Amino acid sequence: MCGQADLALLGIEMKVIFVRHGEPDYHELEERSYTGFGLDLAPLSEQGRRQAQELCQHPLLRSADLLVSSAMTRALETASYVACATGLPLRVEPLLHEWQVYQTGRGNFEKARSLFLENNGALLPSSPIQYETAEEMKARFVDCMAKYRDYQTVVLVAHRMLIRQFVPDRQIDFCQVIECEIEI
Protein backbone atom coordinates (compact mmCIF):
# COMPACT_ATOMS: atom_id res chain seq x y z
CA MET A 1 0.00 0.00 0.00
CA CYS A 2 1.33 3.41 -0.88
CA GLY A 3 1.10 6.49 1.28
CA GLN A 4 -0.74 9.66 0.35
CA ALA A 5 1.25 12.85 -0.13
CA ASP A 6 0.32 15.10 2.80
CA LEU A 7 1.15 18.12 0.70
CA ALA A 8 -1.71 17.75 -1.81
CA LEU A 9 -2.38 20.99 -3.59
CA LEU A 10 -5.71 20.30 -5.25
CA GLY A 11 -6.29 16.70 -4.23
CA ILE A 12 -6.13 15.30 -7.74
CA GLU A 13 -5.38 11.58 -7.62
CA MET A 14 -2.80 10.22 -10.03
CA LYS A 15 -1.66 6.66 -10.56
CA VAL A 16 2.13 6.61 -10.35
CA ILE A 17 4.07 3.56 -11.44
CA PHE A 18 7.33 4.04 -9.57
CA VAL A 19 10.42 2.39 -11.03
CA ARG A 20 13.76 2.49 -9.28
CA HIS A 21 16.62 2.93 -11.75
CA GLY A 22 18.89 0.02 -12.71
CA GLU A 23 22.17 -0.77 -10.98
CA PRO A 24 24.71 2.03 -11.58
CA ASP A 25 28.43 1.69 -12.19
CA TYR A 26 30.38 4.28 -10.18
CA HIS A 27 33.79 2.70 -10.88
CA GLU A 28 35.13 5.15 -13.48
CA LEU A 29 33.93 8.21 -11.57
CA GLU A 30 35.31 7.00 -8.25
CA GLU A 31 38.68 6.29 -9.91
CA ARG A 32 38.74 9.95 -10.94
CA SER A 33 37.71 11.15 -7.45
CA TYR A 34 34.29 12.47 -8.45
CA THR A 35 32.11 13.32 -5.45
CA GLY A 36 28.62 14.66 -4.74
CA PHE A 37 26.58 15.36 -7.84
CA GLY A 38 29.58 14.26 -9.93
CA LEU A 39 28.75 10.67 -8.99
CA ASP A 40 25.28 11.19 -10.44
CA LEU A 41 26.88 11.08 -13.89
CA ALA A 42 27.40 7.32 -13.44
CA PRO A 43 25.83 5.17 -16.17
CA LEU A 44 24.21 1.81 -15.60
CA SER A 45 26.42 -1.23 -15.12
CA GLU A 46 26.05 -4.14 -17.54
CA GLN A 47 23.81 -5.77 -14.92
CA GLY A 48 21.82 -2.52 -14.71
CA ARG A 49 21.30 -2.56 -18.48
CA ARG A 50 20.04 -6.13 -18.29
CA GLN A 51 17.69 -5.12 -15.47
CA ALA A 52 16.36 -2.23 -17.57
CA GLN A 53 15.81 -4.52 -20.56
CA GLU A 54 13.92 -7.02 -18.40
CA LEU A 55 11.91 -4.17 -16.88
CA CYS A 56 10.54 -3.34 -20.32
CA GLN A 57 8.50 -6.56 -20.27
CA HIS A 58 6.49 -5.46 -17.22
CA PRO A 59 2.80 -5.18 -18.24
CA LEU A 60 2.06 -2.14 -16.04
CA LEU A 61 4.35 0.07 -18.12
CA ARG A 62 2.05 -0.09 -21.12
CA SER A 63 -0.91 1.15 -19.06
CA ALA A 64 0.71 4.58 -18.62
CA ASP A 65 0.13 7.81 -20.51
CA LEU A 66 3.54 9.35 -19.86
CA LEU A 67 7.08 8.46 -18.76
CA VAL A 68 8.82 10.88 -16.38
CA SER A 69 12.44 10.44 -15.30
CA SER A 70 14.89 11.96 -12.91
CA ALA A 71 17.61 13.78 -14.84
CA MET A 72 20.31 11.72 -13.15
CA THR A 73 22.12 9.48 -15.60
CA ARG A 74 21.23 6.14 -14.01
CA ALA A 75 17.51 6.98 -14.03
CA LEU A 76 17.56 8.56 -17.47
CA GLU A 77 19.38 5.58 -18.98
CA THR A 78 16.80 3.24 -17.41
CA ALA A 79 13.98 5.43 -18.75
CA SER A 80 15.49 5.37 -22.24
CA TYR A 81 14.96 1.60 -22.38
CA VAL A 82 11.33 2.02 -21.24
CA ALA A 83 10.69 4.81 -23.76
CA CYS A 84 12.06 2.72 -26.64
CA ALA A 85 10.07 -0.37 -25.64
CA THR A 86 6.75 1.35 -24.92
CA GLY A 87 6.74 4.39 -27.18
CA LEU A 88 5.71 6.53 -24.20
CA PRO A 89 6.62 10.22 -24.42
CA LEU A 90 9.51 10.99 -22.04
CA ARG A 91 9.83 14.05 -19.80
CA VAL A 92 13.01 14.69 -17.83
CA GLU A 93 12.67 16.34 -14.42
CA PRO A 94 15.73 17.66 -12.58
CA LEU A 95 13.73 18.03 -9.33
CA LEU A 96 13.25 14.26 -9.11
CA HIS A 97 16.93 13.86 -8.21
CA GLU A 98 18.35 11.62 -5.52
CA TRP A 99 17.92 12.52 -1.85
CA GLN A 100 20.33 15.27 -0.86
CA VAL A 101 23.03 14.92 1.76
CA TYR A 102 24.84 18.21 2.21
CA GLN A 103 28.25 16.73 3.09
CA THR A 104 30.03 14.73 0.40
CA GLY A 105 31.44 11.23 0.61
CA ARG A 106 29.91 7.77 0.63
CA GLY A 107 30.49 7.43 4.38
CA ASN A 108 28.53 10.61 5.06
CA PHE A 109 25.74 9.41 2.77
CA GLU A 110 25.38 6.11 4.64
CA LYS A 111 25.56 7.85 8.05
CA ALA A 112 22.92 10.37 6.93
CA ARG A 113 20.74 7.55 5.62
CA SER A 114 20.91 5.80 9.00
CA LEU A 115 20.02 9.04 10.81
CA PHE A 116 17.17 9.70 8.37
CA LEU A 117 15.69 6.25 9.02
CA GLU A 118 16.22 6.43 12.80
CA ASN A 119 14.48 9.82 12.93
CA ASN A 120 11.61 8.93 10.57
CA GLY A 121 12.80 11.40 7.95
CA ALA A 122 13.29 14.31 10.32
CA LEU A 123 16.51 16.27 10.76
CA LEU A 124 17.30 16.82 14.42
CA PRO A 125 18.96 20.12 15.39
CA SER A 126 21.87 18.15 16.86
CA SER A 127 22.45 16.08 13.71
CA PRO A 128 26.15 15.88 12.79
CA ILE A 129 25.22 15.63 9.10
CA GLN A 130 22.76 17.85 7.26
CA TYR A 131 20.36 16.22 4.79
CA GLU A 132 17.04 16.70 3.02
CA THR A 133 14.08 15.76 5.22
CA ALA A 134 11.16 13.54 4.23
CA GLU A 135 8.86 16.58 4.16
CA GLU A 136 11.26 18.44 1.87
CA MET A 137 11.43 15.46 -0.49
CA LYS A 138 7.64 15.13 -0.57
CA ALA A 139 7.25 18.86 -1.26
CA ARG A 140 9.82 18.67 -4.06
CA PHE A 141 7.97 15.69 -5.57
CA VAL A 142 4.54 17.34 -5.38
CA ASP A 143 5.85 20.63 -6.81
CA CYS A 144 7.45 18.77 -9.70
CA MET A 145 4.56 16.43 -10.47
CA ALA A 146 1.83 19.09 -10.26
CA LYS A 147 2.33 19.90 -13.95
CA TYR A 148 1.33 16.32 -14.84
CA ARG A 149 -2.08 16.37 -13.13
CA ASP A 150 -3.85 15.97 -16.47
CA TYR A 151 -2.35 12.49 -16.88
CA GLN A 152 -4.12 9.56 -15.23
CA THR A 153 -1.14 7.19 -15.12
CA VAL A 154 2.53 8.14 -15.11
CA VAL A 155 5.60 5.88 -15.05
CA LEU A 156 8.20 7.58 -12.87
CA VAL A 157 11.84 6.43 -12.97
CA ALA A 158 13.50 7.75 -9.84
CA HIS A 159 15.53 6.89 -6.75
CA ARG A 160 14.96 4.70 -3.70
CA MET A 161 14.89 7.44 -1.05
CA LEU A 162 12.38 9.51 -3.02
CA ILE A 163 10.18 6.49 -3.78
CA ARG A 164 10.31 5.43 -0.10
CA GLN A 165 8.42 8.58 0.87
CA PHE A 166 5.33 7.03 -0.74
CA VAL A 167 6.07 3.31 -0.33
CA PRO A 168 6.54 1.67 3.08
CA ASP A 169 9.21 -0.80 1.89
CA ARG A 170 12.69 0.00 3.17
CA GLN A 171 14.28 -2.11 0.46
CA ILE A 172 13.41 -1.22 -3.12
CA ASP A 173 15.38 -3.25 -5.63
CA PHE A 174 16.90 -1.97 -8.84
CA CYS A 175 14.22 -1.74 -11.56
CA GLN A 176 11.49 -2.73 -9.10
CA VAL A 177 8.01 -1.60 -10.19
CA ILE A 178 5.56 -0.30 -7.57
CA GLU A 179 2.11 1.01 -8.44
CA CYS A 180 0.58 3.74 -6.24
CA GLU A 181 -2.34 6.12 -6.11
CA ILE A 182 -1.03 9.51 -4.99
CA GLU A 183 -2.79 12.82 -4.45
CA ILE A 184 -1.03 15.60 -6.29
Give names to the regions the model predicted.
Residues 1-13:
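N-terminal amphipathic/basic-hydrophobic helices that include classical n-h-c signal peptides
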Residues 10-12, 60-63, 147-151:
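Flexible, charged surface loops at secondary-structure boundaries
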Residues 15-91, 176-178:
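Active-site-proximal alpha-helix that buttresses catalytic centers in soluble enzyme cores
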Residues 25, 75-76, 99-100, 162-164:
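Short, active-site-adjacent cap segments at secondary-structure transitions
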Residues 28-29, 38-43, 84-140:
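Phosphate-handling substructures
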Residues 51-55, 75-78, 133, 137-144, ...:
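Alpha-helical packing segments of well-folded alpha/beta enzyme cores
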Residues 69-73, 95, 157-161:
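Short, well-ordered beta-to-alpha junction loops that form the rim of enzyme active sites
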Residues 139-184:
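Active-site-adjacent alpha-helix immediately C-terminal to a catalytic or transition-state-stabilizing loop
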